[in-house]
Amino acid sequence: MQRCVIQRALTALAALCLSACGAAAPPADLYKAKAFVTGQDERNRRSGFAQSLPDVLVKVSGDPQLKDDPRVAALAATVETLAGSYVYHDRMEGLPIGDEQGTRDRPYDLTVSFKPDLIDAALKSLGREPWTAARPRIVVFLAVRNHARDYWLARDSEFGTDQRDAMASAAWTFGLPVQLPPGSAIANLPLTFDVPPKERLQNLADAAKAAGGDVALAGAMAWSDGFIGWHANWQLITKDKTYTWAIRDVSFDEAFRSAMRGTAQILSGHGQPE
């Protein structure tokens, strides 16, 4: 009986998601990265450029292992030659500036557009290639347990607005086309916080493809009494293999970064996430 319920729910999911999955294309912002800075002076801007460099190298290559590569830190010494344009977004937009000190300390998101040819050359010097082909479209099926409340994270659900924003931000950081199903399509799917059985994972993979996606990312994220942060498990279902990884005692922002970081690493051919 439960199998029939699951199959009906997955069929509904495919029908409802189909129009939301457009054709895969290279990410428009592939050579952009963001950093948090205070003020708009040149010193902080250089610091923001240096913060952004590892992120754009990871984003373009798909290899998160570059983040801690000491050779990337050495490249940061010439980061201003790699950066093209940049733009600030005031995190306190709409709030008045109180004084001159407030001007220096005002928080901004600095978005840096790097020069594609120079970033590609930098990657080749690090033994990597740019991952510029159309990237697989990912449909995310995520069960959330927040203390006493369990729910599917859906693109239109009452719960999880901040989590949806965090997932979108993480997907942008790693250059991945990601979408959530509508709540009506997954309402009848049984919630589970254990690693799903192989048959269930295959059903999700089939539903993702029927919905116009390329791969399914199944996850379970929980916060309960006694935890000091979120616990998250992820399974990326590809044609050849299902990859599993986990993260513990983190913010949900970091849990989503773990999901997107691992997905990018796998799909770009850089191995199994830890």
Residue ranges of model-derived segments:
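Bacterial N-terminal signal peptides
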Residues: T11-S19
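Bacterial Sec-dependent signal peptides at the C-terminal "C-region" and cleavage site
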Residues: A20-P26
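N-terminal Sec/ER secretory leader and immediately downstream segment
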Residues: L30-T78, L82-G94
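Amphipathic beta-strand/beta-sheet edge segments enriched in Tyr/Trp
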Residues: Y31-K34, T38, T111, P116-L118, ...
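C-terminal/domain-edge helix-coil "capping" segments
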Residues: S47-G62, T111-F114, I119, L123-A133, ...
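N-terminal segment of the mature soluble domain
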Residues: F49-A73, P136, V140-K198
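Signal peptide-directed extracytoplasmic domains
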Residues: D69-L142
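A short, hydrophobic beta-strand-centered structural micro-motif
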Residues: T81-L95, V140-L142, L180, P196-F227
